[in-house]
UniProtKB/Swiss-Prot annotation:
Domain ATP-grasp: residue ranges: 125-310
GO cellular component entries: cytoplasm
Top class in the EC scheme: ligase
The encoding gene: gshB
Full protein name: Glutathione synthetase
Annotated EC: 6.3.2.3
InterPro entries for this protein: ATP-grasp (IPR011761), ATP_grasp_subdomain_1 (IPR013815), Glut_synth_pro (IPR006284), GSHS_ATP-bd (IPR004218), GSHS_N (IPR004215), PreATP-grasp_dom_sf (IPR016185)
Cofactor remark from the record: Binds 1 Mg(2+) or Mn(2+) ion per subunit.
Cofactor requirements of the protein: Mg(2+); Mn(2+)
NCBIfam families per the UniProt record, alphabetical: glut_syn (TIGR01380), PRK05246.1 (NF003573)
Pfam families the UniProt entry points to: GSH-S_ATP, GSH-S_N
């Protein structure tokens, strides 16, 4: 029997209709896995051994009663076969420390999804630079003059921090916007923090597409997150609405080009963000949208994921 641990935000606070981690847990349980629940505070290293204060978990597809937890037991992570790291950003130093603990468990024989080193290496915004042939024109800098020159040249840009999530602190700055200066100061903390500027992509009105890639293979359907009226962010967390749709030719091209590199890096479950035919982000920490896509189309994303996990476990 496969023993699966998950590190996530409090399970008591999730929306099971939309939560991808919950979809994964339900699928694993249906396959007969034993589930163990952890939050970040439950991870520890004791004399070089990665430990988890883990609780046996049962999940139910019931909006009033969706989980039951057993008694916590301090256990070496090496007693598990696989750990899903599903903690949401912020990708802060605490998150980085957690990846080191999980890397220790990996060295002790546990499959970690996604690979801890690659979680550190692949910043969700910056990692797109490795695939710049697919991105809008982009700069990453903390230099206000460089941002101003980029804005001058493009006229309509998006400015965002490198560590945001769910559309937080994303600004659209048009030509002659009087707020450019204060937005630059805020995002760069007066020149002390890197920020990203991208040429605005008008196709955002048709949605910011989330394309899921499982062990290098694109899922054939995406979730287009359509911004609400008067908004430039499609993120569901920012009030956007989701419409599932088949991948376009350009979506396939992007996902197939990036997939092999993701697989090579041990990034087994990844969400690409695409606007029009441009790649804007590569989400590796805890990508979502499984529930919405599986509800709209006959596609078994969690099945793809656990097939990939079992292949890697040699099952």
């Amino acid at each position: 029997m496969i023993k699966l641990g998950i590190v996530m935000d409090p399970i008591s606070e999730i929306n099971i209709k939309k939560d991808s981690s919950f979809a994964m847990l339900m699928a694993a349980q249906e396959r007969g896995y034993q589930l163990f629940y952890m939050e970040m505070a439950d991870l520890a290293i004791v004399n070089g051994v990665a430990m988890g204060n883990m609780r046996p978990l049962k999940v139910m597809n019931d909006a009033n009663h969706w989980f039951e937890l057993g008694e916590a037991k301090d256990t070496p992570l090496s007693e598990l076969n696989v750990v899903l790291m599903r903690k949401d950003p912020p990708f802060d130093t605490e998150y980085i420390y957690a990846t080191y603990m999980l890397e220790r468990a990996e060295e002790q024989g546990v499959l970690i999804v996604n690979k801890p080193q690659s979680l550190r290496d692949a910043n969700e915004k910056l990692f797109t630079a490795w695939f710049s042939e697919f991105t809008p024109e982009t700069i990453v800098t903390r230099d206000a003059n460089r941002i101003r020159a980029f804005h001058q040249a493009k006229g309509d840009i998006i400015l965002k921090p490198l560590d945001g999530m769910g559309g937080t602190s994303i600004f659209r700055v048009k030509q002659d916007d009087p707020n450019l200066g204060v937005i630059i100061e805020t995002l760069t903390q007066y020149g002390n923090q890197y920020a990203m500027a991208q040429a605005f992509i008008p196709e955002i009105t048709k949605g910011d597409k989330r394309i899921l890639v499982v062990d290098g293979e694109p899922v054939p359907y995406a979730l287009a997150r359509i911004p609400k009226k008067g908004e430039t962010r499609g993120n569901l967390a920012a009030g956007g609405s989701g419409v599932a749709q088949p991948l376009s030719d350009s979506d396939w091209k992007i996902a197939r080009a990036i997939g092999p590199e993701l697989k090579k890096r041990g990034l087994i479950f990844v969400g690409l963000d695409v606007i029009g035919d441009k790649l804007t982000e590569i989400n590796v920490t805890s990508p979502t949208c499984i529930r919405e896509i599986q509800a709209a189309f006959d596609v078994d994303i969690t099945g793809m994921l656990f097939d990939a996990i079992e292949t890697r476990l040699g099952q």
